Amino acid sequence: MATQISVDPRVEEEVGRGRSRVLVELRLPAGVRPEGEQRQAIARAQDEVLSRLSGTDFTLVRRFASTPFLALEVGPSALAALRTMGDVVVRVIADAVLPPARGSTPRR
């Protein structure tokens, strides 16, 4: 039985209107690894997801080298494809662009 992934309801709603910017959490093998091996595992999982999204309505926004995530903009066909990737995807969450917190940037 394929592992089901979790999809943020906000993503469902936005994709229903067209496209949504999302973070895709990748499923990596369990266990602690040296940093180099961890980065390789992340890159392999990212490559697998991007390969399987080929031909769907997605845009790569960002690959992360040290965290198991991809930032994407997806439409209905890409979200449908992600739902079938329980072997490499844990969840799909909304990626909201937020302004800096007040007081977190230096004054000029």
Question: Model-flagged regions — what are they?
Answer:
Residues 1-108:
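Autoinhibitory N-terminal propeptides
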